[in-house]
């Protein structure tokens, strides 16, 4: 029997409690909606964690038993304990997958893994977004057509201050004219990282089948191939030294 991928869906979980418009879309939180969709995939065991939990729900035990961590944050990036970020970073470098969603571009963990400001342009005008699939043979785009559209989104625009992605799989066009690198892949240590742009809280983005298909595909892509601590050993030579 194939082992299921162990996914932890992390959410700040503030907007859904403080903003009625968001609560109407995600009554149990964005993390609950994402979790429900991923559970239907059949090959994933999914749990949630939120900012308000002790250690933000990301204890050593939770992370050691997590294959892929998804991350959504916006209002409280600065409230995330640096010790927890150190812990998450260590696990990513050892092989755990990380999927950062939408405004998580400014999260402590994403900026830590990128080493840049991760700044961008933005505009909230409810405009149309067209996501172009520019890597149709990539595992993350499996089952996705040439493009798909979201009728109402927040605009993100270039320049996006990130390191050059190892692979770019989606480019977004917005009704206002901007474009954006909206699906980006990297490897850091033994771990894989995927940034996926859609997900503004006041629109039902995580109810969209294409969006959730991409996230499910990304979970499979980021599933660890190896989980190994990084050490710096003093080693004996293989061959005899003269």
State where each predicted segment sits.
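Aromatic-Pro/Gly-enriched surface loop or interdomain linker
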Residues: 1-65, 233-242
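Extracellular ligand-binding/catalytic regions of CAZymes and related secreted enzymes
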Residues: 2-4, 180, 188-242
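Short hydrophobic segments within beta-strands
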Residues: 8-10, 101, 196
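Solvent-exposed loop/turn segments at secondary-structure junctions
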Residues: 14-15, 53, 75-78, 104-109, ...
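Catalytic beta-strand/loop cores that center a nucleophilic Ser/Cys/Thr
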Residues: 44-47, 120-195, 232
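Structural motif
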Residues: 67-72, 97, 195
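A glycine-rich, often tryptophan-bearing local segment used as a flexible ligand/cofactor-contacting loop or short
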Residues: 76-143
């Amino acid at each position: 029997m194939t082992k299921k991928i162990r996914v932890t869906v992390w959410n700040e979980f503030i907007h859904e409690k403080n903003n009625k418009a968001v609560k109407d879309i995600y009554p149990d939180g964005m993390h609950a909606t994402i979790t429900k969709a991923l559970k239907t995939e059949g090959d994933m065991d999914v749990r949630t964690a939120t900012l308000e939990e002790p250690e933000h729900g990301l204890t050593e035990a939770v992370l050691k038993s997590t294959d892929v961590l998804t991350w959504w944050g916006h209002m409280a990036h600065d409230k995330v304990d640096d010790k927890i970020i150190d812990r998450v970073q260590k696990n990513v470098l050892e092989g755990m997958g990380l999927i950062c969603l939408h405004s998580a571009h400014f999260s402590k963990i994403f900026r830590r893994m990128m080493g840049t400001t991760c700044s961008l342009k933005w505009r909230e005008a409810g405009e149309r977004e067209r996501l172009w699939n520019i890597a149709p043979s990539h595992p993350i785009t499996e089952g996705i057509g040439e493009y798909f559209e979201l009728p109402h989104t927040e605009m993100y625009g270039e320049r996006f201050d990130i390191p050059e992605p190892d692979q770019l799989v989606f480019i977004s066009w917005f009704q206002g004219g901007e474009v954006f690198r909206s699906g980006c892949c990297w490897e850091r240590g033994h771990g894989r990282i995927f940034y996926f742009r859609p997900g503004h809280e006041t629109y039902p983005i995580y109810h969209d089948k294409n969006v959730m298909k991409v996230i499910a595909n990304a979970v499979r892509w980021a599933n660890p191939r190896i989980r190994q601590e990084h050490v710096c050993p003093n080693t004996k030579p293989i061959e005899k030294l003269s």
